[in-house]
Amino acid sequence: MEASGLGRCPTFVVDSDSQRATLESLVRRQDHYDEKYQKNKPLCFHAASFQKPHPLKARNCQMDADATLCSPMLVAVADGVSQIEEFGIDASELPSELLSAVETLAEYQLLPGLATEPYLGPINMIQDAWEATESFGSTTVLTAAIDNSTKIHGKLHPMIAVCSIGDCEILILRTGIDGRRRVIFRTEMQRINGDRQSPLQLARVDETVDPNFDPNVANEVIEDGSAVHCVSAVEGDIVVAGSDGVFDNLFVDEIVNICEDMIPNQSLDVARFQPVDEQLLTEVARQIVLASHAKTQPFLGKYPETPIGLGGKIDDTSCVVAQVVEWTEAYSHAWTQIRSERRWRSRLSCCDGMQPIDEEDSAESAKQISNISLAACAAPSALEQRGACSLQ
C-alpha cells in the first residue's frame, strides 16, 4: 500500500506481528553470519609492510622518516615530519620510538590469554606510548588494534579500533557474499585549515627550535584531536594502512584494484579458509608504494590525476597490508616464547657481570618459532627478526 499522496511504500510500522517477524528474520541472518564467518574466536593481524623514501633522500643517503609496525594485535604507520631536520633533529627517531612503545603496550594489553595489563582504548594507548618516548621531532600516527574482549549479545565479537592523528589513512576491505571485495571503512586525513602540507601532528622540540613551545600540547592533541573509530573484524578482512605518500597520490579505487588483482578471493567457509602468504602481502604493499611514486612522474608528457591534483606529491611513502586471521594456539605458544625471551634479554641487559645471550640458543629459538605453519597464523619469527616485531 502506498503512503497517502507520496507515491511510496509506508515506512512507519506499528503492527507487532510484523515487527516480530522482521526481528526474527534479522536474528536468523545474523546467526547465519556469525556461524559461517565468526565462530566466536579471537582474531589477529597477519601483516607485512613496505617503505620507499623520497627519491631525493634516497640519492643523498638520508633516512626515511616513516615508520611502520606489523604485530599480531596492532598495525601502525607513523610519518615523521622531515622539515624538523633543518634544526639538526633526526626526523626518523620519534616515529620509530613511538611505534616501538605502542607495540610493547599492545603486546601486554591485547594478546588473547596473555594480556597482563588492562586495555583502556586506543587513546590511552597512544598517550602512554607518547609518555614513554624521549626523542625530539614531530610525527603523524595511525594505529589499528584488534580488541578481542568485546562481546555483543553475549558472544565474542572482535573489533578493530582505529586511532588517527594527522594524514595517514586506512582502508578495510571485506569480501561479500557475491565474492567481491568492497571498502567497508576508510578514515579521513586531519589537515590544518585544509592545507595539504600541514597535518595535525605530535611534536616535541627544545627551546632552540621554539622558545615558547608547550610540551603539554601533544597530550592535548591526543585527547582532543584523535579520530577514533571502531569496526567489526571478520576473518579474511584486508587492511591497508599508509602514509600520506600513498593516499595523496592514489585514488581508493586504484588501491582496491591492486589488492583485487594480487590477493586471491578465498572461500569464506572457515573450514577452507587459509591465510595469505606473508610474501604476497609484502608484494602488495610494495606495489601500492611503487604505484604511488609512479603517479608523481609524467606519462606521455602529462602528469596523471591524483587526489590532490595533477602529479601528486613526491614523499616518503610507506604501506602496511594485513589480513585478519584466527589467533591460534600455535601462535599463542610462539608469542609466549617471544615474551619469555624478551624478558630474559631485559634481565641480562640490566645486570652487571652477566654473560651475553648464547647465540646458538637464540638461533634455535628463532628456528622453532619459524616452523609454525602459515595456517597457524604465520610465523611471528619473521616479524621478530626484523626488529621490534616488524617495526621498520
Task: Label each residue range with its predicted role.
Residues 1-392:
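PP2C/PPM-type serine/threonine phosphatase catalytic domain
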